[in-house]
C-alpha cells in the first residue's frame, strides 16, 4: 500500500470534516493503544493545533498505557487532560444489578464517550473515532461507547494495516510492540477475547470480504465461523436506529 498517499488522504479528510462542520478542531480519547496514538498523530499532521486529548483511566488501567499516552502528548505537543473515571464507575457498581466484567467494560466505554462529547461541546470540536476496520466489521466495541464519533479516519484499515501505517509514521515502538487491548479490565486482551491473532482475523475478514473461496477453504473453519457469527450478531452496531415510516 502507498502509505504516503493514504496518509495525505486521511489528513485531507480530517481537515475537510473540521472545516465543513465549522468546528475549531477535534477531541479524542487517548488510551495508550496503537489506534488512538495513530489517530492523534494524523490529527497533529492535519490540523497542527486544536487537537485535544482526554486520558480517562480507571484504577485497573494499565499504567504503561497511561505513560505511553503522556509521552505521545509531549512528543506531539498536544493539549490534554487526565480524568480518572473510577469514581463514576464505582457509583454505577453500587446501583447496577449487572456488574460482570463485560458490563463494567461497556459502562466505562460509555463514561468516556460522555466525557468526550462534553468536551466536544466545550471546545466546539468534533469527536474523532479511533476504531479500525477489523473492530468495526466484527462489532468489537461498545455501541454508544468507543464506537461513537463524528467521523473516523482509520475505519477502512484492518488492524494489521494499522501497524504498517504506524511504522511508516514512526510511532514509538511501545505502541507497535504491545499486545492489542481495549484495557476494559485487568489483563484484558483483544486476541484472547476473539480467540485468534489479528493476523489470522484479518486474513479471514479479507477472504470473506472478497469472497475468495479458494483462500477460505484453507483457513481454520472455527475462525471463519467466529467471524461470520460476530459479523452477523453485531451488525446492528454499525447502523443508525431504524425509524418506522408512516
Swiss-Prot record:
CDD domains, sorted: NAD_synthase
GO MF entries: ATP binding; glutaminase activity; metal ion binding; NAD+ synthase (glutamine-hydrolyzing) activity; NAD+ synthase activity
Binding residues for Mg(2+): 35, 135
Keyword Nucleotide-binding: yes
Pathway: Cofactor biosynthesis; NAD(+) biosynthesis; NAD(+) from deamido-NAD(+) (ammonia route): step 1/1
InterPro entries, A to Z: NAD/GMP_synthase, NAD_synthase, NH(3)-dep_NAD(+)_synth, Rossmann-like_a/b/a_fold
EC number: 6.3.1.5
Residues holding deamido-NAD(+): 110
Membrane-spanning residues: none
SUPFAM superfamilies (UniProt xref): Adenine nucleotide alpha hydrolases-like (SSF52402)
Record's keyword terms, sorted: ATP-binding, Ligase, Magnesium, Metal-binding, NAD, Nucleotide-binding
Binding-site residues, ATP: 29-36, 130, 159, 181
Broad class of enzyme this protein falls into: ligase
Biological process terms in GO annotation: NAD biosynthetic process
Catalytic function, reaction form: deamido-NAD(+) + NH4(+) + ATP = AMP + diphosphate + NAD(+) + H(+)
Any Gene Ontology CC annotation: cytoplasm
Highest taxon listed in the record's lineage: Bacteria
Similarity field: Belongs to the NAD synthetase family.
NCBIfam families: nadE, PRK13980.1
Function: Catalyzes the ATP-dependent amidation of deamido-NAD to form NAD. Uses ammonia as a nitrogen source.
Listed HAMAP family: NadE_ammonia_dep (MF_00193)
Subunit structure: Homodimer.
Name the record gives this protein: NH(3)-dependent NAD(+) synthetase
Lineage: Bacteria, Pseudomonadati, Campylobacterota, Epsilonproteobacteria, Campylobacterales
Gene designation per UniProt: nadE
Amino acid at each position: 500500500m502507498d502509505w504516503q498517499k493514504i496518509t495525505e488522504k486521511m489528513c485531507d479528510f480530517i481537515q475537510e470534516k473540521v472545516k465543513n462542520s465549522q468546528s475549531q478542531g477535534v477531541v479524542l480519547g487517548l488510551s495508550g493503544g496503537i489506534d488512538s496514538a495513530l489517530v492523534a498523530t494524523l490529527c497533529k499532521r492535519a490540523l497542527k493545533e486544536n487537537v485535544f486529548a482526554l486520558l480517562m483511566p480507571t484504577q485497573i488501567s494499565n499504567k504503561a498505557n497511561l505513560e505511553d499516552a503522556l509521552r505521545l502528548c509531549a512528543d506531539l505537543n498536544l493539549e490534554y487532560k487526565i480524568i480518572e473515571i473510577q469514581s463514576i464507575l464505582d457509583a454505577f457498581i453500587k446501583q447496577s444489578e449487572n456488574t460482570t466484567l463485560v458490563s463494567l467494560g461497556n459502562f466505562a466505554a460509555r463514561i468516556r464517550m460522555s466525557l468526550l462529547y462534553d468536551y466536544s461541546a466545550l471546545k466546539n470540536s468534533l469527536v474523532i473515532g479511533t476504531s479500525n476496520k477489523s473492530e468495526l466489521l466484527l462489532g468489537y466495541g461498545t455501541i454508544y461507547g468507543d464506537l461513537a464519533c463524528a467521523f473516523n479516519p482509520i475505519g477502512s484499515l484492518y488492524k494489521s494495516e494499522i501497524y504498517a501505517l504506524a511504522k511508516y509514521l514512526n510511532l514509538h515502538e511501545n505502541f507497535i510492540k504491545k499486545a492489542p487491548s481495549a484495557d476494559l479490565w485487568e489483563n484484558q486482551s483483544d486476541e484472547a477475547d476473539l480467540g485468534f491473532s489479528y493476523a489470522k482475523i484479518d486474513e479471514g475478514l479479507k477472504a470473506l470480504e472478497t469472497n475468495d473461496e479458494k483462500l477460505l477453504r484453507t483457513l481454520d473453519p472455527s475462525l471463519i465461523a467466529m467471524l461470520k457469527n460476530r459479523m452477523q450478531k453485531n451488525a446492528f452496531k454499525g447502523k443508525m436506529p431504524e425509524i418506522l415510516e408512516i
